[in-house]
Amino acid sequence: MTRSRRRALIVAAVAAVAAVLAGCGGSGSSSSASSASSSGSSTAASGSATSSTANKTPITIGTSLSLSGDFASDGQAFEKGYQLWANDINAAGGLMGHPVKLDIISDASSPSQVVTNYTKLISSDHDQLVFGPFSTLLTVPSSKVVNRYGYAFVEGAGGAPAAFGNGLKNIFDVSLPVIDNLIPFAHWLATLPASERPTTAAVATSDDPFTQPQFPAAVKILQNAGIKIVYNKVFPAEVTDYTPIATAVASTKAQAFLLGSVDVPTVSAFIHTFIQQHYNPKAFIATAGPDQGAAFLKAIGGPSNAEGVMVPNGWFPGYPNAASQKMVSEYVAKYGGSPSDVNADVAEAYSVGQIVAQAVNATHSLDNSKIIAYLHSGVTLNSVQGPVKFDSLGENGAAAAFAFQWQKSVLEQVLPVGATGSKPVEYPKPNWGS
């Protein structure tokens, strides 16, 4: 794309923003939702507006989500989180008196498609604002495109170091930096009494920018505590048959197992192999998958196989935050299920909307340059995941790391030990099917 063409597109986008701002003032309301099911397809729909916003131009927010492909489960959860936020912001008066409309395009979990999608959302659809996609894998390429157009890029699932290694000033992750995810778990194992502490541990992780950065610090903590790492393997992200890897882990009889997973199928495959191999580690944590509620339980054969399994994160359905509990209740009312079915993806997406709304309201503007400057100002904002304060890179330095464990069909906060809301860790992990 030529420089002159890019300037023309930016001018067009600014003109669209100006048109909306011309009518902006107080608060109004509407509800909105949108969905897309195929790569490159886009659908946007608005709910009924209240009398105060019914005749006002909507503010359109674009995003690319993985509604199919490898990240479909997470992408669909993100879509629900964005929709819940849009419904709530519109019910509360919209943004600057205008209803919000979501413009969602499916990227089919493809790094190349996500680039095409954000280019379309900004240069063709002229959406005034954009939200981030799911995963660091898709955040890295899309952030470069969004930066080229001068847009703020607030996201909730691109917390790996790779997302912040390009010197971009427009990217902001509302969630916990993934590099800290496994620290509470590693510290807990390392500080167990010597008679209870595992003597061996196995590590297997996908070659993914989300999973790999979580392990170096955790492994070092375990080794410093005298825990021997008897298996440490990085497997290709393209792997679909995990049986050989899981069998190799089981053969070590390691007393603790740390899995770098990005989805439910990965964890499910390991668990089913472990059951077949009669391998039951005293402690088992997976970086993603166990946080997926009903989808996880169904994939592994029910709650009895989930008992004692752990997952790191910065949020869970029982998080003691009034806004979080309201969101969980709204999710259950709209989509059914129980609070345990509301996974962290929903909260991450909802938080993105909250932070963007606070920035828009604080700056009284849809000017992306003003929003970027505000988010870099050191202000502390609030979300359903807790406080948000961005450092110079755009990472959330106020986020806290926790670990959660499935106990009696409920995902409970258990780490850090002694933290508000933490329950006793179930250790050793019960046998599969117990």
Regions found by a protein language model. Name each.
Residues 1-22:
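Sec-dependent bacterial lipoprotein signal peptides
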Residues 274-350, 361, 417-422, 428-433:
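Extracellular/periplasmic periplasmic-binding protein-like sensory domains
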Residues 126-232, 284-308:
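Extracytoplasmic ligand/sensor domains, especially the bilobed periplasmic-binding protein
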Residues 51-83, 105-112, 134-135, 204-213, ...:
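Extracytoplasmic "Venus flytrap"
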Residues 80-102, 194-196, 223-226:
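Signal peptide-proximal N-terminal region
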